[in-house]
Amino acid sequence: QFDVAICETVTRSRSQIFDHASEAMNTVMANYEGARKAAGREGKFSMRVIDSKQIFAGQGLLAAHTLRLINQKVSKNTLRHEVETFTDKIYTCVIPRDLHYIRERARRRGDKSLSAMAAFMGKVLNINPVIFGQGVEGKPVAKTRDFNVAVEKVMNYAIGRLEAGLLTPYVSLSCGLSWTEIEELPGLNRLRDACEKHGVELLLSQMGITSS
């Protein structure tokens, strides 16, 4: 039905999905002509697998930006270039509630960036850090002893960046909470108001089990 397919995966540094998708792409590209002919389609088909270089909400932002470019009917080469360039311009804030849980999940994936002592002290002292970074490279930029305080800090930052001007008219927010808890997040309604005022779409979602 389509002439071009784009698959954007979670960062290849934390998952094998990119490699598996690339293998699938090679199979598709080697065998698509028969299926395309049977469907009555003429011309070539192309497929591209792109490493989003993102985890959590960053991948959703890239998907929204990609769809926007497609709707603008940019050329195939321009689309590929713009998407791959944009992956290096996405910044993410993460607020983990349980550092010990985060460490254990990361350790099973070979990531030893968070020490056992840091995770233990964070849990004992009820510290909720705000981690900020580009792609998967992040570092703590704030530490609070209240989850809601950390959330409000991030909401305030998001509103500030929104008012300063964004490269794409989207803000992606993904939460490992129930919808009731999400709606009660401090600063969420102010963020919604700021998005509406500046013509920005808020992409609000529950975090999938593989992320949370």
Model regions: which residues?
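Class I S-adenosyl-L-methionine
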Residues: 1-24
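Glycine/charged-rich beta-loop-alpha catalytic/anionic-binding loops adjacent to active sites
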Residues: 2-7, 37-50
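Mixed-charge interfacial surface used for oligomerization/domain docking
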Residues: 17, 22-26, 33-39, 48, ...
